[in-house]
Amino acid sequence: MPRVHAIEDYRNFGIMAHIDAGKTTTTERILFYTGKSHKIGEVHEGAATMDWMTQEQERGITITSAATTAFWNGKRLNIIDTPGHVDFTIEVERSLRVLDGAVCVLDSNQGVEPQTETVWRQGDKYKVPRIVFANKMDKTGADFFKCLQDIVDRLGAKPVAIQLPIGSENNFKGVIDLVRMKAVVWNDESLGAKFEDAEIPAELLDQAKEYREKMIEAAVELDDDAMSAYLEGNEPDEATLKRLIRKAVLTGAFYPVLCGSAFKNKGVQPLLDAVVDYLPSPLDVPAIKGTDDKGNEVVRKADDKEPLSLLAFKIMDDPFVGTITFCRIYSGVLLSGTGVVNSTREKKERIGRMLLMHANNREDIKEAYAGDIVALAGLKEARTGDTLCDPANPVILEKMEFPEPVIEIAIEPKSKADQEKLGVALAKLAAEDPSFRVSTDLESGQTILKGMGELHLDIKVDILKRTYKVDANIGAPQVAFRERITKKAEVDYTHKKQTGGTGQFAAVSFVVEPNEPGGGYVFESKIVGGAVPKEYIPGVEKGIESVLSSGVVAGFPVVDVKVTLVDGKYHDVDSSALAFEIASRAAFREALQKGKSVLLEPIMKVEVVTPEDYTGSVIGDLNSRRGQIQGQDMRGNANVINAMVPLMNMFGYVNNLRSMSQGRANFTMQFDHYAEAPANVSAEVQKKFA
């Protein structure tokens, strides 16, 4: 069956926002008005179509990015719903990677919030073209113009209003479309399905003219002919204006801002028009680059005639179909039943069932084309970030980067049956989410779960208990400390065992020095003249690496260290890779002691938004948690306090803050950097763990 929609008619986009800005509600309305959803799901009733895991429906936050296909004005929309909670930034990062464009939703009452900044920065990183939707215009305190100023102040971006609100709070009636210079007013009785063009209210006409002029001036800057015509007194027509706004979105010259209230069903259809008019098709964004099997850079254009390449960006466990792998097809055509190669893992796979997902309804399809986002059932080897491609034209597309977890908990199954279920469940959860790690504590034998924050791990434990029916005891959250050396150390070590039987002999000389922060572990061999034969070097590395996972201060992983093998000795008969491994292990441990290893702790960037009455208490409390106040700011009538606080002092903070502010303050926190722990903290940790 040939392609139904031309690739230039595709819009692969996501909706990004701070938690509670109304992102899921906006997505719901899009599905409702595009005819894909027969009933509007409300988040606060726990019934939203996109939020399809039980955990999401209860918490009213979106955790997993479900991909949905819908249609508007003859264009095919592939919508990826992204989570807005900071513990799930990995999901956002992953979906931004496969999107061509995004709608950034703001709460008009709050403006740009901490998580908006985070997702905006991630959007900048992947160069995602964006439009902005100022939502919740019906809310008390909604202020469209403050949102515009916030985008300048907090995101450092250039916003251009292409709509203005008609009224606000309870009197929010509709919007002024500055491109067409028309008012668009919604009929409250029709659930927002009916709306009509009207003349702009007289009292808003001057304001509309002023903002239209600003919009035109920003647009004509992108085109010399349009600029010349404008300077001669000729305004661009509607088609030219739309073309220039589209150009601005694609180049990031400015960001068009629209407004509405998804909850009150106002402003959603013009937002859909803007998605179609201004966001890119797969042909408008740069072709994806990758490397072939010889390591050469290759480009895959968004074209059905190109060799097949697709990227797995999400893996989910579906109760009906089993494992589902969400993929973005970048080039070529994918047919059900064909063989592909997972070039990242060098494994072959066969494509079985192919599904088009609509939130949690699914439609079986037999073929998919460049630009499509599809769900593949039953892939055995695929993990998030893997490339699948045509075996005759192997390619590995750009890798995704995943952050290191900063918090961990121990989990102990209550019975042998639970132990078996736990193993299967954790393997699936780790495959679905690369920021969730599972390891075994070698000394205690306990299973350790590592994640990005308390909520992240809470939800994983919840899934284990509900979905996989694992009954287990959960330990208190622990901080993921690290260790690093602070000065250069030189060591010589000889391992000798020559009593009876085959002997063991190996001598190594190391120079061990601190690497720059974030530089990781680096090994270099400067052996000349065969002082350590080549075949024993892997043994040397293995010995060092066995110590990296548990350092000498309190048994935590060693980071940012450079080890240089400068000399050594071997014995023709008694030396072996194992002997060099043993020697290197002991030498490296000695070097860590000599190099004055210290304990590093994760420092979190904390932002507290509180009514002014509680500012003193909040600051006093943060100081008592070893927090360093970075600054204060007013946002509306609330005080915003920014601080750097060690993670170990932030456990249970949510309840403390709630009682301190009578539930009126809230906070967000994300990992910022590792820093050396003070001596008293280090001693306390050593006593507990060493």
Swiss-Prot record:
Gene Ontology cellular-component terms listed: cytoplasm
Protein biosynthesis in keyword set: yes
Pfam families linked to this entry: EFG_C, EFG_III, EFG_IV, GTP_EFTU, GTP_EFTU_D2
Domain tr-type G, first and last residues per copy: 8-283
Coiled coil stretches, renumbered: none
Signal sequence bounds: none
Cited InterPro entries: EFG_II, EFG_III, EFG_III/V, EFG_IV, EFG_V, EFG_V-like, EFTu-like_2, G_TR_CS
Protein name (database record): Elongation factor G
Species in which this protein is naturally found: Rhodopseudomonas palustris (strain TIE-1)
Lineage, top ranks: Bacteria, Pseudomonadati, Pseudomonadota, Alphaproteobacteria, Hyphomicrobiales
Gene name tied to this protein: fusA
